[in-house]
């Protein structure tokens, strides 16, 4: 695993390569981007979700991943999420001057999801509200609904953030997942955004 990063005010960027016997992953991000993405995970629906994440968070991101998808896409999906979490943590640096908290409620037709993010340094995920059986649906031919929670678990753990994700409504499995990714994107965008009124670390402890 190799990583590089810069958290200077003008360049909150990071890049990481992660290789295991199950997958090979490269993720590069720029937190102060415009939502430009170059995504290829070999899992088309996941590519679609990560592209939406970039678009609505305004994070520029490159993802290149290959893995044992002939067995199951789980390894590749989770390893990409782990690597994204790591580069997010690296790009944030000491978190000085950020808003820290972000919240968004996002619809996609009949589906509605709410996400609340705290860039706290303490990884925690609360994930609920999906309709019964959502985890068993196969979306796009490869992506099972249960992977949604795994993705958010991996991101929160490795980025060191707290995420409360709640599905308020939804019927179509695709829409339910996409609403969650878009809500997370908007909440993350707000949380990592620089706040010109904040001096130093946004915590009474002096560290995050």
Swiss-Prot record:
TM ranges: none
An annotated Gene Ontology molecular function: imidazoleglycerol-phosphate dehydratase activity
Family from the record: Belongs to the imidazoleglycerol-phosphate dehydratase family.
Protein known as: Imidazoleglycerol-phosphate dehydratase
Main localization of the protein described in the UniProt heading: cytoplasm
GO BP term, pick one: L-histidine biosynthetic process
Enzyme class name: lyase
CDD domains tied to this protein: IGPD
Alphabetized InterPro entries for the sequence: IGPD_sf, ImidazoleglycerolP_deHydtase, ImidazoleglycerP_deHydtase_CS, Ribosomal_Su5_D2-typ_SF
SUPFAM superfamilies in alphabetical order: Ribosomal protein S5 domain 2-like
EC code: 4.2.1.19
GO CC annotations on file: cytoplasm
Keyword Amino-acid biosynthesis: yes
Pathway note: Amino-acid biosynthesis; L-histidine biosynthesis; L-histidine from 5-phospho-alpha-D-ribose 1-diphosphate: step 6/9
Localization in the cell: Cytoplasm
Catalysed reactions listed for this entry: D-erythro-1-(imidazol-4-yl)glycerol 3-phosphate = 3-(imidazol-4-yl)-2-oxopropyl phosphate + H2O
């Amino acid at each position: 695993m190799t990583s590089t990063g810069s958290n200077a005010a003008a360049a909150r960027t990071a890049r990481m390569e992660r290789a295991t016997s199950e997958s090979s992953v490269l993720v590069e991000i720029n937190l102060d981007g415009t939502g430009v993405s170059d995504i290829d995970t070999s899992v088309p629906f996941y590519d679609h979700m990560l592209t939406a994440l970039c678009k609505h968070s305004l994070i520029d991101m490159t993802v290149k991943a290959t893995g044992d998808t002939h067995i199951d896409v789980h390894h590749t999906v989770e390893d990409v999420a782990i690597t994204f979490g790591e580069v997010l943590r690296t790009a944030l640096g000491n978190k000085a001057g950020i808003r820290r908290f972000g919240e968004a409620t996002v619809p996609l037709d009949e589906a509605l999801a709410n996400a609340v993010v705290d860039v706290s340094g303490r990884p925690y995920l609360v994930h609920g509200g999906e309709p019964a059986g959502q985890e068993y649906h196969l979306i796009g031919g490869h992506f099972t609904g249960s992977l949604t929670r795994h993705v958010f678990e991996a991101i929160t753990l490795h980025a060191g953030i707290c995420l409360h994700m709640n599905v308020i409504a939804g019927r179509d499995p695709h829409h339910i997942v996409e609403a969650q990714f878009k809500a997370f994107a908007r909440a993350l965008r707000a949380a990592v955004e620089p706040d010109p009124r904040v001096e130093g670390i946004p915590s009474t402890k002096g560290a995050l």
